[in-house]
Amino acid sequence: MQDSLKLLRRHWEELSRRCVFPEQRSQAVFQLLLQAYAEPQRHYHTLQHIAECLALYSQIQHLLDDAPSLALALWFHDAVYDPQAPDNEERSAALMMQACAGLLSDAQLRKVSAWIAATKLHLCADESDLQYLL
């Protein structure tokens, strides 16, 4: 798990540099995500799942129009997980909006939020980047 955590940290730091996140805020958001994905009720939606998603992302990021937005959507798409709740995706999108407020443009916040919400139904998407997420 330690190697996986190092890999996750490296991915996050690279994304933070690309998005020009201030160091202190970047670390706070990263810690928020680590805590969320380590919650005890999780069995599939864990840090291992995010590591697997990011491994696939690394293989296709050169094909994306907006790689940073897709990476953020991957990081946050299961950040809120209550097995009994019907609105995990919406709550994950809201968490991203709150955590990244002031770090991203309003347009990018809306895009990433919409992409996270789209993971609820996994319907076909018109946007090519979103197709990779789904």
Please place each PLM-identified region on the residue numbering.
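Conserved N-terminal diphosphate/IPP-binding helix and adjacent helical/loop segment
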Residues: 1-50
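An amphipathic alpha-helix signature
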Residues: 9, 13, 27-30, 54, ...
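Acidic/histidine metal-binding catalytic segments
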Residues: 26-29, 66-72, 103-116
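Alpha-helical scaffold segments in carbohydrate-active enzymes
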Residues: 36, 98, 115-118
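Alpha-helical phosphate/pyrophosphate-handling elements in metalloenzyme active cores
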Residues: 39-70, 95-103
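Active-site metal-coordination segments of metallo-dependent hydrolases
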Residues: 41-49, 81-91, 106
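His-Asp-centered metal-binding catalytic motifs of divalent-metal-dependent phosphohydrolases/nucleases
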Residues: 53, 68-83, 92, 114-120
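Histidine/acidic-rich helix-loop-helix segments that form or flank divalent-metal centers
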Residues: 104-134
